[in-house]
Amino acid sequence: VSFIAAQPKLGVADSKNEEVYRGKTPKYVFMYIGDGMSYAQVSSAEMYLGEKAMPGKVTPQQLNFTQFPVHGALMTQDSTSFIPDSASTATSLASGYKTLSGVINMDETKTKEYQPITEELKEDGYKVGIITSVPITHATPAAYYAKVPNRNSYYEIGKQLAASGFDYFGGGDFDQKTGPEGTDQHIYEIVEAAGYTIADTKEEILALNDASGKAVAIDPDDYETALDYEIDRDADELSLADYVKKGIEVLDNKDGFFMMVEGGKIDWANHANDAAASIHDTIAFDDAVKPALDFYRQHPNDTLIIVTADHECGGMTLGYSLTGYSTNFKKLQPVKMSYQEFDKIIQAYKDKKPAQPKLEDLSQDIFNAYGLDLGILTSYESTLLKNA
C-alpha cells in the first residue's frame, strides 16, 4: 500500500532497470512507513471512524493519506520468504535492494553493504531526520542510517546512529544501552560525544529548534523504550505528530530535508492481535501526516510526501463467515486500553496472591477496559474467556 501526495520525485535509480527519473527533485521529502500496515489496517481505521461519527451508517471516514492523488500497491516478499520482516523490507525502501529477513542494508551474503538514500541526500546537503514510535534502534528506523547483518545488534546500531551525522532523531529510546552484556560504554555517552544533544524531557524536546544542532529527542513517557500505544497515551504526552512538528522545526534550512516517520506501534498491536490498539495507532499515524500536509501547502512545488508500509502483520480481517461478515466496529468503541495496560491489571491481581483466583474478581476491570459485561456471556463464551 502506497500513497503519494505531490508530483516531484527523487532522482534515484531503480535497482532492477537503472532507469533514472530526471524531473524536478523535491526540496522537502517526507517518507512515512506504517509498520505492519496494509489495506485491512487502513480500512478498519476508516470504518471505525465512520461508525463513530455516523452510527449505523456504512460510511467510512477517509484518512488524510488515503485522499492523496496517487495510490499504488507493492509486493513485499524478501529474499527469505513471502512473509518478510521489517529489516529486509526497510532495506528495500531505504536502499532499493531486497535482502534476507533480519538483515539491514547488506546483501544476502552479509558481506556487501548497501547505501541508504539518506546518506546520498546528506552528501547533497539535505538535513536528515528519523522518527519512530518504537525504539530508535529497531529495524525500520535503523535501515535509514545503519548497516548490520543482524537486526538485533541494537548496540552496534546505536553506535552507527551516533556516527551517521544525521540531524534529528525522535521518538523511542535506545535498546541495549550498555551493550548486549551490559558491560559496554553507555550509548548516551557515545551519542553525546558525537556532538548530539539528548533531550529526554518534554520541556527539553519542545525547546529544540533549528539552532539546536544535532539532536536526539527521546520520549520521556516511553514504556519498553517506545511511545505508549495511542489508546493508552495521556493527553499531555507527546504524540507521533508532535515529533514530526518538532522535526520540521529542527530540520528547517535553505537546502532542504528528508524525514522518515515510522508508525511502529501499529505493528506491535497487530502482533498481539489487538484490534482496538491497531486502529488507534493507525489513526495516530495518520494524524502525524497532517503536519507534513500543512507544510506541503506552504511549499507545494518543493515538497514530496510518501505514505507507505513495509508489510502486513497479524493477518487482520474485517469479517468472516462465522460472524455473518459483521464488522462490529461499535463494539470496539468502549475499549479504553491496550492489552499491554490490561496486563498490568492482571499482574497486580496475581501479585495479591488470591487464595482462589477467579475471572469474576476482574469483572469490573474487564468492563472498565473493554465494555464487556461478563454477566451476559453464554456458558460457552465464559469458558472460552477463562481458558484464554
Region locations from a protein language model:
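A post-motif C-terminal structural segment
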Residues: 26-28, 37-91, 138-388
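Mobile, glycine-rich extracellular loop/lid and propeptide segments
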Residues: 10-45, 93-143, 160-161, 264, ...
